[in-house]
Amino acid sequence: MPRVIDLFCGCGGLSLGFEKAGFQLVRAFDNWDKAVNIYNKNFIDHKAELKDVHDLTVEYLTAFQPDVIIGGPPCQDYSSAGQRDESKGRADLTLRYAELVCGVKPKWFVMENVDRILKSQTLPKAIKSFKDTGYALTQVVLDASRCGVPQKRKRFFLIGESAGRDCFLENALLNDQKSDRMKIRVYLGDKFGTELYYRHPRSYARRGIFSIDEPSPTIRGVNRPIPGTYKIHAGDATEDLSKVRPLTTLERARIQTFPRDFFFEGGKNDLEQMIGNAVPVELAAYVGRHLLDYMNEKINTPEIALEQLAFNFH
């Protein structure tokens, strides 16, 4: 199995998805002690280290002999929830991720972020680093609800292959998305615990009441009760607030497609942030499966055969 290192692992959504897809995680890193604790309670064949990426060295990472480096650099400086400001410091973590990848030079890498990173000043700098190092790149924005996750959550993926061809995975990732969005009831069944729930909107111009017969809106790092001043929105799933409640922390984890046996412990606010920051497990698995299929196809179809096939068509 391809060996994987996860930078910015959090509580393990991206790692678990890649493990589910058939990769072997050999090491993970994060600088949040509470997330590392949860990670290590759930993964037994490798460990996460409490370490800031600025303290990691190329030599240390290279010793793990990774075939793939994955990671989702913290995205608050790009996200609408964080009032995008690249001067805050988190945006440079994307460049640090690129610096480490380009130093270690694994055959492949996968970087995840919010789709707003496409409008950032940081992404072109990271892309230049990857291209200068010889990576071919696939850039896609995926809708999690079309990739097996009962949640509307658009995420950007930058996937690199050393000495490959640009857009090598784009068609497979985009074309395999489902036409129907995954609904909570379809994914979790009738035993979810509630038919209707409240998710605090960013502004009262947006609705806040949803049904499990639709995908959830994006699970964020905050979870608030229904305010007494809430006014019914035209798009709300019901006008009867007596039938509505906020989701519990574990219900939010299930919508993020963490399995029921994934262990969580700690304070509510920390867990809400941890779960909201995670890459949905099934979205990570979707990307991982397509990458692994591509890897296996490359092994079974040597480059010389591909070049000969192309020559024969001319």
Regions found by a protein language model. Give the residues of each.
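Short, contiguous clusters of charged residues that form electrostatic/catalytic patches at enzyme active sites
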Residues: K51, D92-E99, P124, A253, ...
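Conserved SAM-binding loop
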Residues: Y39
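S-adenosyl-L-methionine-dependent DNA methyltransferase catalytic core
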Residues: P2-L25, S129-D132, R155-H314
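Conserved SAM-binding strand-loop segment of SAM-dependent methyltransferases
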Residues: D45-V53
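Receiver (REC) domain switch-region micro-motif
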Residues: V4, I69, F109
